[in-house]
């Protein structure tokens, strides 16, 4: 038995006169004076079907009992709607199907929420009934675009000579960075597998094994606290190459990225993408993932305010802190309440306050202007290029606090002043991150990325003497202020790798225990190698203009790492625990 001969949402006036068989779910049912109209939905959209007793009394009688989300199959002829019934807002709005036969395939209970877009339903309810939520057009469209984007990655990477190779899901735990998800081994009592946080080590092994261009659509797992753009399991397009320098590799990735956006969205991206080194990104935008859809850059005002009597600035300069400013062009429209809200906001990032000055036709005005000489004020106006109607914001603190506070305030002000063009796609590379950062909690240095990242060649000489000044040969791909991918050149010299481990406090025994097979492999002619990984969930979220990656994942977890539909994680039987040589402590 054939249920359907066409998809509902793609029928047009070109199909008028054709006999068609359709199947799907009842979206809406309307009874207009004895003629019953039903919007029949499938994954492509919906079409209006008409039950007229003059065409089929039996089908009309059956349609009396139809309710929302009943599953039916119908046969009928496509005809043009009368002019007054045309709906230009939908693709099928010029046609309707006159039903000759109907088969009821299944009934449905009343859904707990409307299965339409623009619904005001809590996310918890949607996730509990995800099998219903998936029927909504926006959800399907997001997942279909994800499929298209993933397919485009496969096509363009394959066209560039990359080979799809699977790497193990069960591996040993190498506790660096986030916590591992652990899987107990039944056959090896007391031993555990770890689910991969990334295929990093295995893809380097593939390069040593002679696979010079690898990719994989890889499932990765991290046991970390969640937020809007994080999940315990996530998907990345994992990529590695050998015998390519950074410029060559980034050029390939730019072309792959541009081709994907062109194929899926029809948008031409200019290449090459702009590049900013990490230090310039922080100095200009206060962020290592800057949103460049608008200006509003940070301004160094230290020389302009030097010699002023404002204690906050004087103390900052005396303690060798930094002072930076944002010039909110047209900020005169911001109220005192807005300024107070901004002051509270920067406090989240450690700022002890937010100084401000309005620019009027009389010059600078605020309760702190009296502490600045006319010369100071003149220099502030010059260096900030401030004009009447602008509003200046200042933070004076350590570099970390100042950049974090103003970098985030920059985004908040841009939203408030409507400076962001939501239709823009601004890609850029942020390169040469610090190789190490200081962990104040652990009181030691740690790897900014991972312990296999190579330093830039010119900084190898200071690797042991000034490690915190060493730049890494790394690159992050940023889209509209969000990191969507990142990677770098890898260490392929076992001697350099040993120095890195030593600096990180990983002794020879510990290194061998965690990474022994990679360290052994590096001794057998490892080639120069580099790579990166794109976060598919985040890529799709941004291109689809969604606020959360949960909107672009078929079965997402909540911020507590739970699946509300299936009820995982869950308890297991005592017998299962015994087989795994485990017991639960109360």
From Swiss-Prot:
Residues that, per the record, bind L-aspartate: 176, 222, 449, 490
Positions of the record's site feature: Important for tRNA non-discrimination: 32
GO biological process, one term: aspartyl-tRNA aminoacylation
GO MF term set: aspartate-tRNA ligase activity; aspartate-tRNA(Asn) ligase activity; ATP binding; nucleic acid binding
Keywords, alphabetical: Aminoacyl-tRNA synthetase, ATP-binding, Cytoplasm, Ligase, Nucleotide-binding, Protein biosynthesis
Location within or outside the cell: Cytoplasm
GO cellular component terms attached to this protein's record: cytoplasm
Keyword presence, Chaperone: no
Residues reported to bind ATP: 222-224, 231, 483, 535-538
Positions of the UniProt region annotated as Aspartate: 200-203
Transmembrane segments: none
Oligomer status and interactors: Homodimer.
Family statement: Belongs to the class-II aminoacyl-tRNA synthetase family. Type 1 subfamily.
Known function: Aspartyl-tRNA synthetase with relaxed tRNA specificity since it is able to aspartylate not only its cognate tRNA(Asp) but also tRNA(Asn). Reaction proceeds in two steps: L-aspartate is first activated by ATP to form Asp-AMP and then transferred to the acceptor end of tRNA(Asp/Asn).
Name the record gives this protein: Aspartate--tRNA(Asp/Asn) ligase
